Amino acid sequence: VFYGGDDLHVDSINVTGWKPLGRKFHVTKSDGSILQELDGIPAYDVYRKYLNIRNDENFFYHTLEFPLFYEHNDTTILRTPVASNADGSITMTSDIDIGSVVRISYGDPGTIIESIRHDSKKIAQFGPDLLHIFSCAARRTFWTDKEPTYEISPFQEIAPSCGFFSHGEFLRTSGNLNQHNVTLVIAAMREGERKEPIGTATLSNENSMLKVPLVSRLATFISVTSLELEEMNMKLEHVNEKLK
């Protein structure tokens, strides 16, 4: 579908809400969507060691909430494991370049809700005539006890909308076209001057969702201690350089 016009205005956002967990890994071997090694060891071994996930038919369902998180082309990218292979490699939803620095991530409801609150205000200020909403099917699975459109409904209250759940979302950032996963991508469009929103964006049961679960507190603890360990290692390297 191609849109054009002398007075057509477009704005776009992407919402993740997944937070990095634990230490960093370097992609040392990959081939397209096949992630072979992280820090020189089979990629599957990382998921087995840190999440105790078995290499069986349930691998996809157990890793769905723990995609890999990294920065690329000035934006955050998530990649979800699809299957584990006999050689210890992992088939991902899309490619990850060799040299990328990745971390395992987890979905934090509070962060997701805060992102939706912030970005829905941005979209409302744009004053769209129409919203195109594309959300990864993995996000639908994440909100297991909610309606499938739970995190989409606030945007639907701003302007008429259409879209679908997807297996990959595309968005151009800083001149680069990026493929996302586990991401909510919204394109807002209008002709002429901004319009007043048809309603106010709200999330049902928002307060109950903001209660911090145990896993979130543990993840914060791990992330902070990992950062402190990295800082200590950097200081030790600096001291060693001085002693040479």
Predicted regions: what they are:
Residues 1-159, 166-241:
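Small-residue-enriched flexible segments
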